[in-house]
């Protein structure tokens, strides 16, 4: 009997699709770019973003790659903002980046950042979703933590994170999840987030 209880515990602890109170935790497959900026001239910066957003290039980029783009302000960071670019999967990202990189409008927008951001403090990295619960795109505020997991220990950390969040579902009204850094960030290998519709 003891052997069967232990086997059931192992299966429960390592199940990737834990469901608790109708909250499923699994990867949503998304690939995202985090583009960190320190804005020095907010008006000029927003005008550059708006100009690009109204361009034929941006329209083609969105329609052909289904990209989702949003601007976020930061607190407790060396950067003032980040532009989050989200694709459904790696294939959509490849298509989207090819379109974005081929347009003069995107080049002009990026060039304008020399005048309205501190480019010495700009950086970006790419991540993929490992696990997500609830729909994060409806949330407007997030607590986000970047950290480094020792190589080979992602599964242990992921299971611990899911176990902790499952035990705290009554305290979490919004989304939560974990992303794996693919490249661009030597300081962090992962990030976890907890979102909500308001503070």
Please tell me what each predicted stretch does.
Residues 4-14:
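Sec-dependent N-terminal signal peptides
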């Amino acid at each position: 009997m003891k052997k069967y209880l232990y086997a059931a515990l192992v299966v429960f602890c390592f199940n990737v699709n834990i469901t608790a109170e109708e909250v499923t935790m699994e990867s949503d497959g998304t690939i995202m770019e985090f583009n960190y900026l320190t804005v020095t001239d907010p008006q000029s910066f927003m005008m550059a973003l708006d100009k690009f957003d109204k361009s034929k290039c941006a329209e083609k980029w969105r329609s052909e790659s289904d990209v989702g783009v949003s601007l976020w302000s930061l607190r407790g960071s060396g950067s003032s903002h980040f532009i989050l670019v989200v694709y459904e999967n790696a294939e959509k990202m490849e298509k989207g980046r090819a379109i974005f990189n081929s347009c003069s409008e995107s080049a002009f927008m990026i060039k304008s950042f020399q005048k309205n951001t501190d480019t010495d403090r700009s950086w970006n990295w790419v991540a993929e979703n490992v696990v997500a619960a609830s729909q994060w795109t409806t949330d407007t505020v997030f607590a986000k933590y970047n950290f480094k997991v020792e190589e080979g220990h992602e599964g242990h950390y992921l299971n611990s994170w899911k176990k902790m969040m499952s035990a705290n579902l009554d305290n979490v009204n919004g989304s939560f999840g974990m992303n794996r850094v693919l490249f661009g960030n030597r300081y962090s290998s992962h990030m976890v987030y907890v979102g909500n519709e308001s503070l």
